[in-house]
């Protein structure tokens, strides 16, 4: 008789052992990458790359395999053999192997782009999988660039893939970008957008820029023909508190897939000379209604600091300093309050939580539904700022001795809320929790969900 319980236990054991082996392999591979980076830095090489497999050869004809593989686009009248050869001899740099970069790279590799450069300093984690479609659970913890390379070579082994596993910055950007024909901005932060724009203007490289947030996406091509650059449209960066990335605002995976695929399309059009490139225009996608709009954007700014006839910026600058933001999409803590106006999460647990107080969670209702602290009441930040919460807590707010604690996901929105509430109730003790719910998980309760 089959012992089903024993078989199930054996299966569970094997799955656990396989997961442990994969994790060990990922750690070893990361150690190797770190060692190669150290060697690269010691020898003055700014790249983490794989050897050039085509030796810089200019292909003048297609192989039988090329013809069979790419036949459906070869028969397009405006594409043909010459279009495929241009793709085969082209190189595209994709900055960010996330929700935009993954589908863009997938379609470029599938279309027969000769060389792809993949830039990403980050590692694969579980929160990536719903939109970053080249990565897999088996490669959790692996460099995103390396993970994408594995998937792309399974799709098309003839595509040369170069991995740059370090953070793009002012010191290495020019060296890396100059070896590619087209650049795709698939990043999720303002500092990198300015860095890429300035480098592409200086090196005269077309820049295909995409973005996606919630159910919306945008796409345009900068530094192409007589079209404007990013600085022409945004000469001054926005304040840090006005910037929302997908880690804070959320995004539907299919929206990033839509924009990423269209970034690949624009890159192909630039390389092949196909159709009307999206320069001087902005494509806006509303995923909630599936509507596309195509609008004209301003022309080149005559006094642009980078792309004008007499530019003020002729070399790359410190973009994190210029933007007041980190060049990553990781937690970027704001510093809007003095230290005495803030509360450490452990101090809250040990002292304040045991006493009467009003704990206001300023996240959106959808986020509050995911997880919340005991006794927290949900008042979204927008309601705090427009004072619509006042009637709800009129009795509590009459007691000036009752501490008011503001809480959010990471400790950023709560600072904005504190500033506003303090102006309305200057006699109250009003503070926020440093690091928000992320800090609660990391320092107090590891079982508390993190997202």
UniProtKB/Swiss-Prot annotation:
It catalyses: [molybdopterin-synthase sulfur-carrier protein]-C-terminal Gly-Gly + ATP + H(+) = [molybdopterin-synthase sulfur-carrier protein]-C-terminal Gly-Gly-AMP + diphosphate; [molybdopterin-synthase sulfur-carrier protein]-C-terminal Gly-Gly-AMP + S-sulfanyl-L-cysteinyl-[cysteine desulfurase] + AH2 = [molybdopterin-synthase sulfur-carrier protein]-C-terminal-Gly-aminoethanethioate + L-cysteinyl-[cysteine desulfurase] + A + AMP + 2 H(+). GO terms for cellular component: cytosol. It is an enzyme of class 2 (transferase). It comes from the Eukaryota. Its EC number is 2.7.7.80, 2.8.1.11. Binds 1 zinc ion per subunit. Pfam families: Rhodanese, ThiF. This is Adenylyltransferase and sulfurtransferase MOCS3. It comes from Drosophila ananassae (Fruit fly).
């Amino acid at each position: 008789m089959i012992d089903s319980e024993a078989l199930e236990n054996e299966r569970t054991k094997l799955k656990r052992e396989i997961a442990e082996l994969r994790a060990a392999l990922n750690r070893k591979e990361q150690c190797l990458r770190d060692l190669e980076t150290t060697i690269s830095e010691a020898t003055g090489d700014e790249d983490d790359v794989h050897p050039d497999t085509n030796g810089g050869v200019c292909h003048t004809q297609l192989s039988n395999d090329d013809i069979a593989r790419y036949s459906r686009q070869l028969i397009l009248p405006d594409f043909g053999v010459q279009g495929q050869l241009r793709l085969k001899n082209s190189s595209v740099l994709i900055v960010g192997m996330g929700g935009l970069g993954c589908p863009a790279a997938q379609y470029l590799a599938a279309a027969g782009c000769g060389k792809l450069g993949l830039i990403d300093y980050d590692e694969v984690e579980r929160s990536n999988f719903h939109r970053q479609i080249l990565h897999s659970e088996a490669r959790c913890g692996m460099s995103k660039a390396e993970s994408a390379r594995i998937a792309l070579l399974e799709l098309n082994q003839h595509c040369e893939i170069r991995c740059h596993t370090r953070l793009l910055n002012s010191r290495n950007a020019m060296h890396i970008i100059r070896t590619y024909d087209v650049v795709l901005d698939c990043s999720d932060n303002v500092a990198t957008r300015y860095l890429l724009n300035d480098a592409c203007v200086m090196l005269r490289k077309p820049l295909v820029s995409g973005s996606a947030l919630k159910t919306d996406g945008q796409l345009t091509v900068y530094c192409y023909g007589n079209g404007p650059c990013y600085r022409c449209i945004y000469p001054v960066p926005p304040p840090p508190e006005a910037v929302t990335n997908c880690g804070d605002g959320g995004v539907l995976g299919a929206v990033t897939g839509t924009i990423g695929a269209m970034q690949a399309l624009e890159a192909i059009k630039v390389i092949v000379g196909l159709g009307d490139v999206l320069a001087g225009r902005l494509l806006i996608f509303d995923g909630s209604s599936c509507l596309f709009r195509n609008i004209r954007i301003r022309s080149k700014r005559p006094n642009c600091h980078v792309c004008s006839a007499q530019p003020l910026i002729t070399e790359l600058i410190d973009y994190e300093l210029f933007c007041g933001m980190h060049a990553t999409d990781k937690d970027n803590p704001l510093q809007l309050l003095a230290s005495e106006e803030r509360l450490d999460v452990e101090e809250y647990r040990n002292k304040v939580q045991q006493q009467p107080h009003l704990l206001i969670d300023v996240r959106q209702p959808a986020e509050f539904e995911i997880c919340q602290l005991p006794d927290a009441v949900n008042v979204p930040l927008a309601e705090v700022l427009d004072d619509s919460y006042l009637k709800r807590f009129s009795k509590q707010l009459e007691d000036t001795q009752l501490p008011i604690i503001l809480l959010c996901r990471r400790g950023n929105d709560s600072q904005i809320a504190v500033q506003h509430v303090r102006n309305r109730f200057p006699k109250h003790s009003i503070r926020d929790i440093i690091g928000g719910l992320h800090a609660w998980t990391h320092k107090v309760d590891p079982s508390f969900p993190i997202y």
